[in-house]
């Protein structure tokens, strides 16, 4: 009976030998209520249509292809679909949201609105866009695209002013100048409508600089007016530069309603597409995997800039992307990161995903889920099951009392026996 506490302690020490619970560099999920947004590296349909069907093209394990939890499109991204004619209707829903896309709009594509524009501005736009997407998908279950209907009472049509290579901007739309206007010093309006979603992410953009047309310089000025609430959202050009500027966008989160787009100078812009956010949920951080090229192409870090705790966990490989299918598809490091989608995990943190919820040598930063208690389990003389000192102290006291009782009893019986002899 008195050996039981000692037996428990010895069993605890033996059971803890060699155990560790470090954070792992993967994306995972607490349960089956998750969803992934991606590109060709997780586009199972694209692989099915290749000949032969070579799944080494993907970083995603093909066992997940029939899960119904993936919305991916080769050659595309959510940002690219949001702004340009090259469109894919990303649609998905889950408590735990994972993003592995963005590489299809990088400095490698060198997009800018005009020949004297700036791709740096578009990288800034990308970062601001994904910031809004990640923040809002931490509190919404559902993401999809919706068209935004608008009514312009003039005779002018939308124009493809902003284009580069194969990319043509169509969100927001530019309304061309009316034929009876001699310059761009005029005010013009258009109605647009948001309905059917809890909230929407829409673009509000201006050329932030002196826009030259026919020897005249113009300052862009754009506003959205909510006719139901009276709230005004606006941007005015503040820069005096005449080259090296581009289309600066802010990404507004708006409620349903009737809106008026207003231009006080230069061309009127009006949103044509929106991210539709639906089904509020309890706060659940999103997970983002860095979407980048092999080093032979220039990538950016805008998804990393956008993904900040506590609303987002960022995962990245420590090595260059080197694919096995081709140089940009099928990298072992990123395949390892996505392998966490094959199983449930109890705890997520800034450092990584914890496979167990008992103890770890690393204290989870910005933890979410059922997370372990930190303890120094790298010290070989200290078992992980004694990370809390109070049970150890109590156990020591009990062992001491047991030893004293045993000694007293032995002395008592020895004396008793000696007396009888």
UniProtKB/Swiss-Prot annotation:
Keyword Transmembrane helix (UniProt): yes
Q: Which Gene Ontology biological process is one annotated for this entry?
A: fusion of virus membrane with host plasma membrane
Under the subunit heading, UniProt states: Homodimer; disulfide-linked. Forms a complex with the M protein in the pre-Golgi. Associates then with S-M complex to form a ternary complex S-M-HE.
In which compartments does the protein localize? Answer: Virion membrane; Host cell membrane
- Renumbered residue ranges of the record's region Esterase domain 1: 7-127
Question: Which parts of the sequence are annotated with region: Receptor binding?
Answer: 128-266
InterPro entries attached here? Capsid_hemagglutn, HEMA, Hemagglutn-estrase_core, Hemagglutn-estrase_hemagglutn
Q: Which Pfam families match?
A: Hema_esterase, Hema_HEFG
Respond yes or no to whether keyword Signal is given for this record. yes
Residues glycosylated per entry: 54, 89, 153, 236, 301, 316, 358, 417
Q: Which GO terms describe its cellular component?
A: host cell plasma membrane; membrane; viral envelope; virion membrane
Q: What does the entry's PTM section describe?
A: N-glycosylated in the host RER.
Q: What is this protein called?
A: Hemagglutinin-esterase
Its membrane topology is listed as:
Single-pass type I membrane protein
| Function as written in the Swiss-Prot or TrEMBL entry | Structural protein that makes short spikes at the surface of the virus. Contains receptor binding and receptor-destroying activities. Mediates de-O-acetylation of N-acetyl-4-O-acetylneuraminic acid, which is probably the receptor determinant recognized by the virus on the surface of erythrocytes and susceptible cells. This receptor-destroying activity is important for virus release as it probably helps preventing self-aggregation and ensures the efficient spread of the progeny virus from cell to cell.
Q: Which organism is it from?
A: Bovine coronavirus (strain F15)
